[in-house]
């Protein structure tokens, strides 16, 4: 058996003559892999193989390399630990500073590279599809200059027409104002800023101006001026002292006395003339109808006569210039209290009833003007005779609880004389609105209100009616309640007997008092139908019209007449 234990520190197996470098490998081989010696013949004839010699040589070389690596590592470690702790710390600090400087230099190089790439991308792509920015800016500046020149020319033309209109005599101005021109009058004093803007708009239109942008801008200024005037009037009302309350009360009483005097003068003239209002003097019958009081004289503005006008749909309808109760700073202490007695009350068919249209709230912010169209319906069927109330300007939302949106002050009253009571009679209100400068009103919403209960009593009260979307078809009451509401728009009105008109005329109209109005009671369709058969026999024909009423119907354009449906 060959013995290799003395060569290079190798360990040989006693059973198979294999050599190993460590005792662990030899033990593992002996325990698991050793198969013993070869046969004696082979053992005697064989010599150590070339493979074994080559493996021994390779293992010796590897061992020498490992020893050299261990020696160099030990030397390096000895050199590093040879110095003092301070020296080692300085070496580490220097190494750290050197590495940080290298890192910063690399970061700056990367940033410069990124900026260079961005510049190349901008130069390749270019702004707005490849057009260079200077040319783009030049084109925008040129367009802005052209638009400014057009606006300047329009303003100069408008100023020239306005100066020419001021130089003309008053008679010529009246002649120009008599030309048919459909515009919506503002209910403000001529001295206000809104009235001046309205005059400016008239001058622009009479001069031939039809630019929609200019008209829209003037209309926006008019709305802002109206809102500013309303805010100023509210501020003045809040600043009234106790000393001025008596003066305002005396002024209101004087206006009442003046209205009564005018009413007596009218009655005197009618009694002297056998043909009624057709023989009235010219200054009372034709041109100055605004000086005459309404049938029930209001305390502040006076009701003008009903005039025939062409509505915005092309059909002729009666426009009632209702009483516009702009309060002149009266204190609530001297007015009708908010909790006035209103509720179901006996009804006098001869006298009729009166409807006060106070205001609208929750309107869409895109609406500029609104108009209310009213009519009567029996059992859901329209009886004809639609009437248009005066248009109202949309104002900003008041700072008070209520529906969100703009508001509009209607301030109109509508007498309904000689109406037979019936639980099937209802009031139908249609809301129309103007958008922008198109001047074509569009129907937006509608509402209905029953006028009598099952006991044929008039449903007096302050009512708030939710305005519902179209279509306004002949539906039952239950079906009407299922129609969705048009946003948050609501109509606020008062329904009273004709004998209560004087007291209700003194009530203040303020959109901030929306909480004083209630929703009408819900009435089922079955109860209404049963009450119709119960009370149908009790209906009586209205009395025949008197001679004065006949004359008023014949000449309704010459004097005041009740609001007809």
Swiss-Prot record:
The keyword Electron transport does not apply. Residues 97-160, 219-271 form a coiled coil. PANTHER family: COILED-COIL DOMAIN-CONTAINING PROTEIN 17 (PTHR33820:SF4). InterPro entries: CCDC17. The keyword Coiled coil applies. This is Coiled-coil domain-containing protein 17. Residues 58-87 are annotated as: Disordered. It comes from Mus musculus. Keywords: Coiled coil. It comes from the Eukaryota.
